[in-house]
């Protein structure tokens, strides 16, 4: 799983026993793309390295995938900006760097297309986590 990335990063997966047999009706390619975008965000925003944990849980017909890192985290201002401006694509402000924010936009669109929700949380210097929640097939 860690092949092809710097030794400064470790990626771990934790699948809760109750999630092992949960079923999510989805486009696997798109869900993989969303997860990859979140992992790449952790790597990109933590050039000094970090630990990235992907965890999968299942409770009451909800499948929850969390991508968390112990990197630089998010300031309250950046967190608010991500919530208020889910992406910069719609902006006509030429001062904005359009390379930023598009990965999260794509993740949000993929999740919502699958009837799910996305929540970003983080604390400055304590890491960031993105929680994707989906209704699972019983």
Please provide the spans of the model-predicted regions.
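Short helix N-cap motif at coil->helix boundaries in the Bergerat
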Residues: 73-81
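Acidic ATP/Mg2+-coordinating residue in the GHKL
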Residues: 69
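Short alpha-helical Gxxx[C/S/T] motif in the catalytic ATP-binding
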Residues: 103-107
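Conserved micro-motifs of the catalytic ATP-binding
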Residues: 23-26
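Short conserved segments within the C-terminal catalytic ATPase subdomain
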Residues: 3-15
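Short helix-loop "hinge" at the ATP-lid/N-box region of the Bergerat-fold HATPase_c
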Residues: 42-43
